[in-house]
Amino acid sequence: IHCPEDNKECGVISINDGQLIDEILDCGEIKNKSNINIKIKDSANAHVNSINIVEGELVDELIDCLSIADSSVEIKISSSVSTSANTISITEGELLDETMDVKNHIRNSKIDATITNSANAFYSATMTITGGELIDEIIDTNEITNSKIEIKLTTSGCASYIGNNAGHTFTLTNGELIDEIIDCSNNISDNNPISITVENSANVITQNSSNHVPVLNITNSQLLDELVDCPNIN
């Protein structure tokens, strides 16, 4: 979605319990040496005057399945799932949520997820996140057993000011820029090699030629929280 820069009245977008991209792969089981390769490039971006997301996302659940066993999954997201606007509001929503939603388990498998220059928010007046995130749950599952997991985030999940307004504000309440890269509700077991790399991400950036001081309001929130959320790792 693109609004021409010379048309300031163009582009007021509201996403309520919806997405731009949802469930590229929606299935039961991924098994028997399956090889899944998903690449998202220059997609699901919104360059508009104002964007309001309520209980929705730009991208949600690229993979939605019951289980993954004896298989390989590779996901690459680049220059996607970002927004630039005068005002940005996210309430109980995300730009990128549950890249992989695996209801039951991941077993004897290899998962490789790379996110580059994506899920970024560029604002020129105000940005507000309430109970939401820019990136949440790259992997959401119940159990990970005997699997190799590699996740790399580079220049992603950032909030960047790009205007010249004296009164610009960034407000983060009960939310995060990046939260729960792996959310495993039961256990991670059998010596799983898990590698998570975060580079130049989850930053609040002010680029202001007029030297206006931004107003930053961060309440009960974090920029980066819970790389792995799991009750048992053994």
Go through the PLM ranges and name each one.
Residues 1-234:
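Low-complexity repeat regions of mature extracellularly deployed or surface/particle-associated proteins
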